[in-house]
Amino acid sequence: MKALLFFLAVMLGAPAGSAQEWEAIKADGAYIWGEGWGGSVEEADRQALAALTSRISVVVTNDFRQVEEQVLSSEGDGHYLRTSHRSIVHSCLTLSNTHRTVLKKGRKAHVGRWIHRDELERIFTGRKARILEYEQAALLAEQSGRVDEALRCHYWAYVLLCSLQRPSELREPDGGMLLNRIPERLNAILEDLSVGMTGHDGDVVSLRILFRGMPARGMDFSYFDGSRWLAGPGVRDGISSIVMAPGALAETILLRVEYAYRGDSMMDAELRDMMDALDLKPLKKSFIFFRTL
């Protein structure tokens, strides 16, 4: 009966509740674990999660090919990935997919964190499915001219892809490697945007935004008004407008197309954590200059 209760506690993520049960977890090769100490349970928990991350780094290293300074476009411009193996592994761990036991509370708190090796594999398997779903949604959005949705889905797919153990192995049915294709698709969308001024009334500038020759059905952007960056009102059916600072209307205006949608990612704790862990620099092609004359 005791063994059954312990098994249920481990599977359900309930605190094991005793040092003896924690030692059993540590001795069982089916689990990867970490423990931490601190002046509070919260501090000890952070230390335990960091220790677990370090141990998983060793496990994953055996079959993980680190992607270092991977260029997002075949032309060599745009977006570089510079991140450590440790930060990528950290991105697969969240408070929701690891288990915790509080061994001691108070100013000498002691906390254990663990995950079953099979659970770790399930995390990566589920992530692969999400990547393919995002890519399918992105391609459909491209076909209908929904630039915002296409960029968001492509970029989120890429963030998830970079967190896999072997990102270069995830391919499309024709054998194409998504690690190359997603960056190319992101840059192609940005290259196929054209922005022009259709008129202005004082400091209010009317814009026309085309995507592959047709009115963009949706796009989000920010712009430099001559003194600061401001959020634009968005694009609907190829039409938008901006308000420049008084007297700041110049021959060229700079827009920055939104593609990461970090605010929306806050609804997905796992995706948000990965965005924080991966050091992805901005896509250069997301900055668009257009002439007002």
Language model: regions and residue ranges:
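Hydrophobic alpha-helical segments and their boundary regions
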Residues: 2-3, 37
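Sec-dependent N-terminal signal peptides
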Residues: 3-15
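Domain-level marker for long, solvent-exposed, non-transmembrane regions
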Residues: 18-293
